[in-house]
Amino acid sequence: MSEEKQHKRRVHYSGKYPKKFEEKYKELNPEKYKDTIEHVISKGNTPAGMHISIMVKEIIDFLDIKPGQTGFDATLGYGGHTRAMLEKLEGQGHMFATDVDPIESEKTKKRLAEAGFGEDILTIKLQNFCTIDEIAKEVGGFDFILADLGVSSMQIDNPERGFSFKVDGPLDLRLNPNAGISAAERLDNISREELSGMLYENSDEPYCEELAKAITDEIRKGNRIGTTTKLRHIIEQTLDFLPEKDKKDIIKKTCQRTFQALRIDVNHEFEVLYEFMEKLPGALKPGGRAAILTFHSGEDKLVKKALKAGYKAGIYSDYSKDVIRPSAQECAQNGRARSTKMRWAVRAE
């Protein structure tokens, strides 16, 4: 008698971050596996391919949205904040949103349309949020504005986008993969001095000089740094001198800072944010409110300085002297919320 053919074993779902993005984990089908998604979130993790919006209640409470108003979401992303603001409009008024990511913005547009928020109440523009003045001029200004400056989890979780050092992928880091040059291309011709300055200015990297030397030496040898794994390995080798008890944690933080510095550079994030903050007062109607979420010291300092200057000049009637942070409960449920700071301002009447 012939042996019975063994069935292939089903891949056991552990509820953890997928090792390979392309594997069909339940996390990638949230509409079918709500219990699984809730389980992952309850553990303080973000399900793969999803983004959990941060400080939604605090933002909605501050913006004080009324039906009939006109609002602007500077960074559409997964659309969680946008949806919460749309719900407050109760079918009256209009929301405008911008995003430079053609891949994720199309998915979010479809997701929001299926939830009942179509083009009659929501206009999505594939452009940078520093063009807020152009949109404001068309519509007569905004009653409320939100700018969430964080990178969406969908981008981080997709290896093909090159945002994460945890998985192998092309070293890209562009928010819009169709515009500008990738991080790998940026490194191709960068000098040691320029790279050291970039790492220091964009992420306060304490090992900026050592890393800049190691990276540029590798490129000078003809070894292109084209993948996330390649860059991570160079960082690991550069910091191999560290004591064993500290090495793992320091390398992880250094990887985070290095990838952050490159992402800020290739997307011109500081230049875009500076331009946005300059145009923000003119885009708000008298009495209009703006809330901004920052995620690292560089952008937070820029936002704080701009709001304070606007208040002193009489442009804003009030602004946040201190930052508002996510609750301990939210940080426990969403680890990516821990570094978030919320600042706000009210346009003078």
Swiss-Prot record:
Keyword rRNA processing: yes
Coiled coil: none
Entry-linked InterPro entries: RsmH, SAM-dep_MeTrfase_MraW_recog, SAM-dependent_MTases_sf
MF-aspect GO terms: rRNA (cytosine-N4-)-methyltransferase activity
Annotated S-adenosyl-L-methionine binding sites: G79, G80, H81, D99, F129, D148, Q155
Keywords: Cytoplasm, Methyltransferase, rRNA processing, S-adenosyl-L-methionine, Transferase
Domain of life (superkingdom): Bacteria
EC numbers for this chain: 2.1.1.199
Swiss-Prot/TrEMBL catalytic activity: cytidine(1402) in 16S rRNA + S-adenosyl-L-methionine = N(4)-methylcytidine(1402) in 16S rRNA + S-adenosyl-L-homocysteine + H(+)
Transferase recorded as keyword: yes
GO CC annotation, single: cytoplasm
Locations listed in the record: Cytoplasm
Pfam family, one: Methyltransf_5
Role noted for this protein: Specifically methylates the N4 position of cytidine in position 1402 (C1402) of 16S rRNA.
Family: Belongs to the methyltransferase superfamily. RsmH family.
Name of the protein this chain belongs to: Ribosomal RNA small subunit methyltransferase H 1
Organism: Agathobacter rectalis (strain ATCC 33656 / DSM 3377 / JCM 17463 / KCTC 5835 / VPI 0990)
